[in-house]
Amino acid sequence: MGNTATKFRKALINGDEGLACQLYESNPQFKEALEPNASYGEPYQHNTPLHYASRHAMTRLIRSFLFCKDGNPNKCNVHNETALHLLCMGPQILLGEGALQPRFSRPQEDQQKRAECLQMILQWTGAKLDQGEYERANVNATDNKKSTCLHYAAAAGMKNCVELLVKNAADLFVENEDRETPCDCAEKQHHKDLALSLESQMVFSQVPGAQEIEAEYAALDRREPYEGLKLQDLRRLKDMLIVETADMLQAPLFTAEALLRAHDWDREKLLEDWMSNAEECCQRSGVQMPTPPPSGYNAWDTLPSPRTPRTTRSSVTSPDEISLLSPTDGLALCGICMSSISVFEDPVDMSCGHEFCRACWEGFLNLKIQEGEAHNIFCPAYDCFQLVPVEVIESVVSREMDKRYLQFDIKAFVDNNPAIHWCPVARCERAVRLTRPGPGASDPLSFPLLKAPAVDCGKGHLFCWECLGDAHEPCDCETWKMWLQKVSEMKPEELAGVSEAYEDAANCLWLLSNSKPCANCKSPIQKNEGCNHMQCAKCKYDFCWICLEEWKKHSSSTGGYYRCTRYEVIQQVEEQSKEMTVEAEKKHKSFQELDRFMHYYTRYKNHEHSYQLEERLLKTAKEKMEQLSKAFIGRDGAPPDTTFIEDGVHELLKTRRILKCSYPYSFFLEPKSTKKEIFELMQTDLEMVTEDLAQKVNRPYLRTPRHKIISATYLVQQKRREFLASVARGVAPNDSPEAPRRSFAGGTWDWEYLGFASPEEYSEFQYRRRHRQRRRGDLLRLHSLRSNTPEPHDSSDATAGTALPETQHMNEPLNDTHTHSEICALGSLDEDDPNILLAIQLSLQESGLALDPEPQDSDASVGASGSSLPSRLDSVPQTSDPPRASMSSSELLELGDSLMRLGDISSRYTPFNINSYPDALGTAFSPSDPDCLDPSTNANLLGNIMAWFHDMNPQSIALIPSSASDAGNETHALGEPAKAEQTEAESAEMESKEGEVSECVEDAKTEASDLTVCPESSADPQHQIVEKLTLRGHKISSGGLRRNVFSLGRRWKGFSCITK
């Protein structure tokens, strides 16, 4: 039993099919006990009998193992190989593993046997799976090298096995560990026919959604904004333009052609001149004004109809020309040779009426054509500028001369048409027409064009539209010239070691900036802590870190360990260090510029080299298309569409050329700008999709399905157009400099926002404010406010900052003490702050105060609304009588000074207002007098000031009763007149200040006699003012706002503002 098994195993290993079959069939007991799925163990790499039978293609044993012994072809050995792997390897691959030498002499027979065994394995069905299907041989199983059975079959060149595997859904695109597909394996082993067959099946493989992708790509408009034209296309384009123009103008073809030629073949320009003055337009073009065609003439021609007999002479012949008739027979004479024109000669009619014999016509036209003046041939008569129609030229000259005339005519058509250029390549007779989209064009091709777009004549000749040189988009011609000049100056072929030199210069600069050399061995030393006594770790030299001199020269007299007082030596060392640093910086900057240039130049050359390599694909693309068509036609019966290969190569070359020229464009962009960042992002995106398409197309054998190549081509085309359109639009707007931030509260206003005509005027205004003369009493007032403020007497004043109820009296007499908050506010008072003055002026403008003391009707304070200051300024009603309150800056300043002085005195001694003082005439202003009191004006003033403060500062403002009212315990209504009792000391002090108060009131009344500042009125002023002010918020924290509001509130009869 054991001997039979051993002999059978050896026969299987050696590939002796006859001996193995004899042992297997002759011993029924051994046959019954044999397990084809049992492994022979680790010494035999865990191969099974089925593995060895498949390796040597033993047909009878494989059939018996699969269908009689329940053999499983999916069983793997130690290399993760199944029976299919070993079967498809072939004798070339298994040469060192058995007696396969005789099979080389019979390769066809061996391939046939392996195909039969493969077919049996593919027909095998195993156990029933969970999904209701039966287990089958896995044709896509991979071994340790990630190779499938199709890889081995393709490498062995077994065409029949490959076809069977492909029919059974073998994966054509799977790659092994060497990133090779089955097609690559066949090509590597020089099985070209098999590789071409696999390539065609890979390219034209159908997957779900592939047809939709191809149909979508076919429906796309892949036209470019230019069109290559042949000579026939140029003639057809010219004829169509003439016919369409003649139809629009209702003119003969010859007239329409002459008009177009005179207007550079621009129909829009012609129509504009035609609509302006048609007769003058025809006169400048050398043609007569078209008239309705007479009977017997064609509508679109100038030649007479064949049905109409020819007249003896033109009806428009002048009297002078009538004398040229022959006196004998009445025949016309030729105006050139003076010979009689025979009646049997074909007529040459001109609209001008001049007649010449046919021989003279032919000689004249031949001479003009030979001279190259084919587009402007006038009548040969003296001082006649009538153009000769094309029909006349074609009917007179010979056929050869007519062809030459047509060539000159087409050349003149192209030369005079700014939308058409000839191809600059030698011996190329093609032209290019460029279509520039107009503004708001709805055509899908109406993306913006570059200044110097690249065009193609149709033969692959790319050139710049502007300079007719090599195509260089997205660069314009000037940028391209600058780049070429830069390359010639830098000589990059001589800059091989720029990167290394740049790194050395950067290291040298860092060492000079962060270290010092040893005074003995010049080794760089970096100090991070400690005293000035340094010891070189290399040469053990002791020196001073400051002056780099020997440490022996230092002692306590030179500053000790942490100072060095040797001035001359230190200065010398610093100068040397500075010179070395400056030199290193220059060197580093120079190498930095060189390194930057090499960065762009290297990538420029890389794309240029790739373009040269991929340009060869144009020659092989057509051959590849024919080969794929022939290889795939046997299966489908109809040749497939292979134009996608050529389209992909063309798109790849276009994009590669743009990427090549994009680096010169990026080189001249402003460094670290938004435009450059966006441009480089788009450039990187375009490079990624271009390289992906290159990997799919630039291969000896394509390994990508057609729909994926089509999708990649379309994606590259879309990215390319977006890239060029973005560059044409400017990529991104230029980076604008940061605008100066305006400061409002507590600071200065911009001159334009304040209404000044220029910054100089605003500066002059500020200068006048700072240097104005002080009035009598100002210095005393400021001195008393800032220096002589008495201290609080008791602790009860510390609570003066708390808010009181609205019903508390605000008109109690003031004592000589102030709360701490009032003292701080008065001490920080800044009378030069222009913000408070601006607020007063705006309030006066809105109030509309007049010169006369009569009250004016005004609405509630717009300052209480939530609108901003500019909107409130715009909402001021325009009246026919402008208000007097719009005072100048100097008047407003003087008024502010007077109010401040008046407010300081009045707020400290008595709750009065300026209307309670006598004016210059001795009359007194009473608050209850309707002729001089406007409560809405006062409320509007304070409301606008509070609204302005709220707009300038996000925090809020709280107005509370002043601390002066804290001393009183009685409660009075806010709107009642002030009737507080004064002590004798207060009366005496009041009398001493009466002169100063009168002077302040007089100044204020002189500058603004119509100003009333009185919050007290009979119309419940407490309710009005508090309601208006509480709408604006509750507190502020800015120092400037606190000073302004406090200074105004302090003078506003019993109100003050404090910081909470």
From Swiss-Prot:
Residue stretches making up the UIM domain: 831-850
Region (TRIAD supradomain) location: 330-568
Zinc finger region(s), IBR-type: 402-477
Coiled coil spans: 603-632
Top-tier EC class: transferase
Binding residues for Zn(2+) 5: C544, C547, H554, C564
One GO MF term attached to the UniProt entry: ubiquitin conjugating enzyme binding
SMART domains assigned to the protein according to its UniProt record, in alphabetical order: ANK, IBR
Name of the protein in its database record: Ankyrin repeat and IBR domain-containing protein 1
Organism: Danio rerio (Zebrafish)
Organismal lineage: Eukaryota, Metazoa, Chordata, Craniata, Vertebrata
The gene coding this protein: ankib1
